[in-house]
A protein has these predicted regions:
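Polar, enzyme-active/binding microenvironments
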Residues: 1-296
């Protein structure tokens, strides 16, 4: 008699049993896998990138870093530094065309080779939510403006930042997916408490929508307003990952290394990257998220 080993016996992990196809949160066959380590362990950095084979990480801690590293799908290469060292900043765009903002009021644009100083944010803040798509449609949401939690929202048009309608809930360290025309903002801290509520942006106003399953903040995000991915948090360090399908949040495979205080990148909830972050110290490891999109 031939006895087949189960997936659990082979992999030694707990898996979720589903009644039909293994599809959760609008993604199928989803998992995190290890990628190449950053050259320098860091947290509180900004990040940008279209997918897990082309990304950029810049700034961060310890110290107000100026470091910039670019990922090619297997390894990180150090490139030209930011003009202004800072931490707890956000980033948006790709590995060759991006914007870094926050961790103060400064913003800088990246052309694939160099950083150029651009127009400042209107509100000085850090640990803000940053968009995940093209840098010319930048979006800066919430954060910490010392003193107090920020509800301010700013939209970038490729040249300057403009204040737009504030969120219903002021929040520090929120998750943001999308751009300045359509986005979803979730989680964050109201100092206290940590919240689970989420809001949708339609280009002019915010509307409350379904809450995330686990209230948390200071993690990474990827995707769009109809297909988002949020992952990690700190404190406490968490690997929880949730996918948004346009109407509900579903918990999917956790990060291998629980961590937070780091920006994530990825233009879709099927392909994302999380590099660096903070557990009880800054880390250098990279994790790549890959999932199959669900089609009708």
């Amino acid at each position: 008699e031939l006895i087949m080993a189960t997936y659990k016996e082979i992999k030694g992990v707990t898996i979720q049993t589903l009644d039909s196809d293994p599809v959760v949160g609008g993604v199928a066959g989803a998992s995190w896998s290890s990628g190449g380590n950053l050259n320098t362990a860091k947290s509180a950095s900004g990040a940008s990138g279209a997918n897990n084979s082309a990304a950029l990480v810049f700034g961060g801690q310890p110290g107000n870093k100026t470091d910039t590293e670019q990922y090619n799908g297997s390894s990180w290469t150090e490139l030209n530094n930011l003009n202004t060292g800072r931490d707890y900043l956000g980033g948006q765009g790709t590995s060759t065309a991006a914007i870094a903002f926050g961790g103060g009021t400064q913003s800088e644009t990246w052309d694939g080779t160099n950083w150029t100083e651009g127009n400042d944010l209107n509100t000085n803040r850090d640990t803000l939510g940053s968009g995940t798509l093209a840098y010319t449609e930048g979006f800066a949401v919430g954060g910490w403006k010392n003193p107090g939690v920020a509800s301010e929202v700013e939209s970038y048009d490729g040249t300057s930042w403009t204040e737009v309608a504030e969120m219903n809930t002021a929040r520090n360290g929120p998750f943001l997916s999308g751009d300045n025309t359509n986005a979803i903002c979730s989680g964050g801290s109201t100092e206290p408490p940590v919240v689970a509520n989420a809001e949708l942006w339609n280009g002019s106003s915010w509307t409350e929508t379904s809450e995330i399953n686990t209230a948390r903040y200071n993690g990474g995000s990827a995707g769009t307003y109809t297909g988002a991915l949020i992952f990690g948090s700190n404190p406490p360090a968490s690997g929880v990952t949730e996918a948004w399908n346009g109407s509900a949040w579903t918990e999917v495979a956790d990060l291998t290394t629980a961590r937070g205080y780091q920006d994530g990148a990825g233009a879709a909830n099927t392909n994302a990257i999380y590099a660096g972050g903070y557990t009880n110290t800054a880390v250098a490891n990279t994790e790549e998220w890959t999932a199959a999109p669900v089609t009708a």
